[in-house]
Amino acid sequence: MSVAGGLEYLEKLRDFFYGLAELRDRLKERGFTWPRPYPAEGVAAGTVKVKAGFPAMLRNGVIMDVTNVEQAQIAEEAGAVGVMVLDKLPYDVRKAGGVARMADLKVIEEVMSHVTIPVSAKVRIGHYYEAFLLQEIGVDLIDESEVLTPVDDQHHINKWLFTVPFVNGCRELCEALRRISEGASMIRSKGEAGTGNVSEAVKHFKALYRAINELAAAEEERLRDYARQCQAPLELVALTARLGRLPVITFAAGGIATPADAALMMWLGADGVFVGSGIFKSQDPRQRAEAIVLATAKWDDPEAVVEAQKMVSERAAMVGIDIKTLKPEELLQTRGL
């Protein structure tokens, strides 16, 4: 179709939709009630289908941690599939110490009003009411996160009580299965947030898939033993073994700071990546955001990843933290069961 023909077609399409809108308004004035085109239960908010389906739409994408509208707009312009609003970036949480809590609701709402991509926010492990508040203001995804200070070390939120999908972190398969059994619609690796060091995320993803591969070759009795060991439903263990992966979308997170880091995690089996401090604690956030988005989407194309890596400079990257220098009590990944 020529350019002129395409424009003519778009004009006709516009006139058609305007005509439909006028017809709708006239019928409304006459008191016409619109019939439901599909059963309500098929699209009801909060169903497993809806809560698991939303994260599936984010595959091969990047969700970026942000603390304000300006950062959120940079993320959107770079091609991020979503933003995660925090009070402080994980690197700053680690440096500041003290109690890390949910971001200000006003800041979250301000971000929601300025970007068109999905907006998520973190809550403290076990803090039901932070989660209820985020659901009330209409966030798209809630992260029950070890980056914030837990209010309950022994019990996570029962996510079946909410209509908004949740994401939780894990270090290995048992942890992931417990979170899914609690209602998590999405899983991510914990890694070690705020370090700019991807080594822990790599370790967690390898542990996750090593266990899944072992289950895939296991007999039924072994699956029963594993379910008891993990304190997870046998049906969930069996489904994971049959699929050869977790039955929910699984993102990588924790220390991703370069396009190569993102591509590595995708190669290890991630469906997408969360990037925390790696972008906005660098000296080239806009270019780095674009480069990580490109490397994540095109991770299986070496030429594209080379192009992405050339977009950033190692000299501009955030100053990383060697995991070995952290004391046990400084590790964020150990929070939660």
Curated annotation (Swiss-Prot):
Disulfide bonds: none annotated. InterPro entries: Aldolase_TIM, PdxS/SNZ, PdxS/SNZ_N, RibuloseP-bd_barrel. Its EC number is 4.3.3.6. It comes from the Archaea. D-glyceraldehyde 3-phosphate binds at residue 206. D-ribose 5-phosphate binds at residues 65, 194, 255, 276-277. Belongs to the PdxS/SNZ family. This is Pyridoxal 5'-phosphate synthase subunit PdxS. It comes from Pyrobaculum arsenaticum (strain DSM 13514 / JCM 11321 / PZ6).
